[in-house]
Amino acid sequence: MELRVGNRYRLGRKIGSGSFGDIYLGTDIAAGEEVAIKLECVKTKHPQLHIESKIYKMMQGGVGIPTIRWCGAEGDYNVMVMELLGPSLEDLFNFCSRKFSLKTVLLLADQMISRIEYIHSKNFIHRDVKPDNFLMGLGKKGNLVYIIDFGLAKKYRDARTHQHIPYRENKNLTGTARYASINTHLGIEQSRRDDLESLGYVLMYFNLGSLPWQGLKAATKRQKYERISEKKMSTPIEVLCKGYPSEFATYLNFCRSLRFDDKPDYSYLRQLFRNLFHRQGFSYDYVFDWNMLKFGASRAADDAERERRDREERLRHSRNPATRGLPSTASGRLRGTQEVAPPTPLTPTSHTANTSPRPVSGMERERKVSMRLHRGAPVNISSSDLTGRQDTSRMSTSQIPGRVASSGLQSVVHR
């Protein structure tokens, strides 16, 4: 018995969660390709997936926008089938011991600004800019940054007249508190400036490893958000960015200086970081930190394997008094046999390019990520899978995610 959607896509295991609904690994039966399938129960109090799928369709054709394969309803679920992507920047950040080099941060910043600019050009703001919502591509697109999850996106201007939405206050926080702009904390309607300010906090998060307002304790979520807001507003940008190139402070100051309906100068912000990139003498080779770690891990595995074989060889000779003290080739000739090296066990580096390891837990979480980075591994692992924790700082007044139960897919079953 297998589960199918759209009479073409085979439903596999759960691989993550979006702002509304759960994400599953799937297979395009006709093409033999793996895909991502997002499901949302139609009985959810505030269905959002059909809205998100419409936004994705409006975004189609943009660089770093996932391709949508199919949208529709199947039984008790709204379904969206989309291109399968690689690990998120949060996954990769954990893999790199929660610290990115300046080069990697600048390479990412360039693409991330462009993704946000493209969304804004399509008359929408994202409203949940965070590392989990930027994924790397797979295979030939392994160096391309994608932006995902439009569950909280909102139209900020009329597509025909470009009339901007009105300024409003007393709005509830929508998005993730850790990266929310100060104006969002103050209850001001979000606009283009807020997406970019959130990106500034993401970049400093990559630089620092954590932000000053992380880990704050409070009795309720509301009080926690208030503490985050107070800490964020009381931390001067120059203090937040101390020890790092001034361009990061310049970026954040620029974002905070924008008025509600201002169009940001995206080219200026990109050039700010590109000039820094060139002054540092970096090369646009798109070698990120995780690529270097992957290479280092492969080389270390090879060295360890050679050392193991040498150790076994020495032990074998030490147990044979007739050959003790003789080189391995000589001992082989004395026995009238050829010297045969012991078989090499499989290591993570010996997998084929499109093989994905099964998820593991506990002490092997980091190993799970390292084995799948840029090998064409199809699984999009969420940061909560890696850390065993969930980010509870995300809040939207209408967010009531639907959970998928296997028993609820009866109408999707094909025998």
Swiss-Prot record:
The keyword Heme does not apply. May be involved in Alzheimer disease by phosphorylating MAPT/TAU. Exhibits substrate-dependent heparin activation. Drug-mediated inhibition leads to a delay of the oscillations with the magnitude of this effect dependent upon the timing of drug administration. Inhibited by phosphorylation. Repressed by 3-[(2,4,6-trimethoxyphenyl)methylidenyl]-indolin-2-one (IC261), N-(2-aminoethyl)-5-chloroisoquinoline-8-sulfonamide (CKI-7), 4-[4-(2,3-dihydro-benzo[1,4]dioxin-6-yl)-5-pyridin-2-yl-1H-imidazol-2-yl]benzamide (D4476), 3,4-diaryl-isoxazoles and -imidazoles, and 4-(3-cyclohexyl-5-(4-fluoro-phenyl)-3H-imidazol-4-yl) pyrimidin-2-ylamine (PF670462, PF670). InterPro entries: CK1_Ser-Thr_kinase, Kinase-like_dom_sf, Prot_kinase_dom, Protein_kinase_ATP_BS, Ser/Thr_kinase_AS. This is Casein kinase I isoform delta. Its main location: cytoplasm. Monomer. Component of the circadian core oscillator, which includes the CRY proteins, CLOCK, or NPAS2, ARTNL/BMAL1 or ARTNL2/BMAL2, CSNK1D and/or CSNK1E, TIMELESS and the PER proteins. Interacts with DNMT1 and MAP1A. Interacts directly with PER1 and PER2 which may lead to their degradation. Interacts with MAPT/TAU. Interacts with SNAPIN. Interacts with DBNDD2. Interacts with AKAP9/AKAP450; this interaction promotes centrosomal subcellular location. Binds to tubulins in mitotic cells upon DNA damage. Interacts with GJA1. Keywords: ATP-binding, Biological rhythms, Cell membrane, Cytoplasm, Cytoskeleton, Disease variant, Golgi apparatus, Kinase, Membrane, Methylation, Nucleotide-binding, Nucleus, Phosphoprotein, Serine/threonine-protein kinase, Transferase, Wnt signaling pathway. One of its GO terms (cellular component) is cytoplasm. Changing S97C: In breast cancer samples; infiltrating ductal carcinoma; somatic mutation. It comes from the Eukaryota. It holds the Pfam family Pkinase. It catalyses: L-seryl-[protein] + ATP = O-phospho-L-seryl-[protein] + ADP + H(+); L-threonyl-[protein] + ATP = O-phospho-L-threonyl-[protein] + ADP + H(+); L-seryl-[tau protein] + ATP = O-phospho-L-seryl-[tau protein] + ADP + H(+); L-threonyl-[tau protein] + ATP = O-phospho-L-threonyl-[tau protein] + ADP + H(+). Residues 301-315 have a biased composition (Basic and acidic residues). The gene is CSNK1D.
